[in-house]
């Protein structure tokens, strides 16, 4: 089944832009072989990508993306089935937002659309694209440092704490507004 997956992430500070360009070129070759299409937006700090293709292939590629050390804070924004491809001709089209105005990027994304029903702003996936472009990808984003920079320090022992042999369950769940 044709699947659309959208995610965003943050580029590691140590990765130069030429590595991004090399990655895009390699992904285009792989995506063509795997029947994956989509777009990649980059604002100099954040990636926003829409992938579309066979469900298992999209999910496998996304799992590889999540493990890629060139970026972090990977957040899946949408995963849904689609009746047709939105970007059937683009293996992975890169839009560098630093080089184009907001309206120009939005129009270029619309121009790359191949759906028999032209992409419109009412399209759910395009609403994500539009929001990323218009907010410069930074508004409303709480940046979490990379996992390898975290330090967890225990607070002083609480007298009301459960005994050390008591079973504990802790669950961290990300919240997205």
Q: Which residue ranges define each predicted feature?
A:
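Charge-rich, low-complexity N-terminal segments
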Residues: 1-177
């Amino acid at each position: 089944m044709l699947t659309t997956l959208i995610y965003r992430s943050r580029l590691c500070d140590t990765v130069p832009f030429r590595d991004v360009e090399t990655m895009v070129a390699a992904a285009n070759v792989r995506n063509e072989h795997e029947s994956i299409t989509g777009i990649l937006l980059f604002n100099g700090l954040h990636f926003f990508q829409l992938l579309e293709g066979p469900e298992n292939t999209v999910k496998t590629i996304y799992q590889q993306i999540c493990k890629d050390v060139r970026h972090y804070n990977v957040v899946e924004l949408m995963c849904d089935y689609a009746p047709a491809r939105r970007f059937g001709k683009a293996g992975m089209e890169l839009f560098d937002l630093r080089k184009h105005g907001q309206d120009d990027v939005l129009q270029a994304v619309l121009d790359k659309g191949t759906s028999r029903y032209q992409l419109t702003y009412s399209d759910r996936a395009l609403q994500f694209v539009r929001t990323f472009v218009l907010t410069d990808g930074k508004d409303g984003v709480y940046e979490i440092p990379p996992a390898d920079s975290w330090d967890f320090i225990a607070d002083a022992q609480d007298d009301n704490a459960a005994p050390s042999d008591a079973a504990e369950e802790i669950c961290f769940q990300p919240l997205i507004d």
